[in-house]
Amino acid sequence: MNKDILTQNYAVALFDNAKSDNTQDKILEEVNLVTSIIEDNIEVKELLSSPIVNKVDKIGVINSLVKNIKISKIMQNFLLLLIKNSRTSILADIANTYSKLLYESKNIKIVQVISANKLKPTEQEWVKTNIEKELKQETKINFEIDPTIMGGIVIKYDSILQDYSIKGSLDKIAKALQSVNVFDCHPVA
């Protein structure tokens, strides 16, 4: 089965379970916490993703992880289901999809803002305010850094890309210059 479909199915199942308990926000925190713990610990990540390690050992790892952090029964059962079905390798994707489902249910638009340098809190607030004014909707902004854009920002949401970066401007100029045919120009007499 396609990875995106699997991810969507698991995220929807987790969301529906959380919704029935009215714990959607708590589950988002938990799935992000568990994901970051697993992603940050390479040994645990490899162990849980390995087809060689038996499921009993994987369950033991999850149980010891759960002892150290307080997570709900829904999240514990979900992690055990992922182990049972050998799907722990898609946990990070499930967390991202779950996050999108939660924000969609609250009518909050997820927006990615890329800048060359880390934006100051006042700059982040200014960007958020102006994006929300443009979209006429509450947003959840994910700020990212990409030095290759040189300056300015790039805004992404849904299938929209707004490029206000120096690199984007230079690319447009380069493309325009490439389309100009120098041989068609006639010298002025």
UniProtKB/Swiss-Prot annotation:
Q: Does the keyword DNA repair apply?
A: no
- InterPro entries reported in the protein's UniProt record: ATP_synth_OSCP/delta_N_sf, ATPase_OSCP/dsu
Annotated keywords? ATP synthesis, Cell inner membrane, Cell membrane, CF(1), Hydrogen ion transport, Ion transport, Membrane, Transport
**GO: which molecular function terms?**
proton-transporting ATP synthase activity, rotational mechanism
Q: Classify the protein's membrane topology as the record does.
A: Peripheral membrane protein
**Gene3D superfamilies from the UniProt entry:** N-terminal domain of the delta subunit of the F1F0-ATP synthase (1.10.520.20)
Pull one GO CC term from this UniProt entry: plasma membrane
The primary site where this protein sits is membrane
* UniProt keyword Membrane present: yes
Please state where this protein is localized: Cell inner membrane
* UniProt similarity note: Belongs to the ATPase delta chain family.
User: What is this protein's function per UniProt?
Assistant: F(1)F(0) ATP synthase produces ATP from ADP in the presence of a proton or sodium gradient. F-type ATPases consist of two structural domains, F(1) containing the extramembraneous catalytic core and F(0) containing the membrane proton channel, linked together by a central stalk and a peripheral stalk. During catalysis, ATP synthesis in the catalytic domain of F(1) is coupled via a rotary mechanism of the central stalk subunits to proton translocation. This protein is part of the stalk that links CF(0) to CF(1). It either transmits conformational changes from CF(0) to CF(1) or is implicated in proton conduction.
Assembly description: F-type ATPases have 2 components, F(1) - the catalytic core - and F(0) - the membrane proton channel. F(1) has five subunits: alpha(3), beta(3), gamma(1), delta(1), epsilon(1). F(0) has three main subunits: a(1), b(2) and c(10-14). The alpha and beta chains form an alternating ring which encloses part of the gamma chain. F(1) is attached to F(0) by a central stalk formed by the gamma and epsilon chains, while a peripheral stalk is formed by the delta and b chains.
Q: Which PANTHER family match?
A: ATP SYNTHASE DELTA CHAIN
Name of the protein in its database record: ATP synthase subunit delta
- Report the source organism: Rickettsia bellii (strain OSU 85-389)
The opening ranks of the lineage are: Bacteria, Pseudomonadati, Pseudomonadota, Alphaproteobacteria, Rickettsiales
What gene is it encoded by?
A: atpH
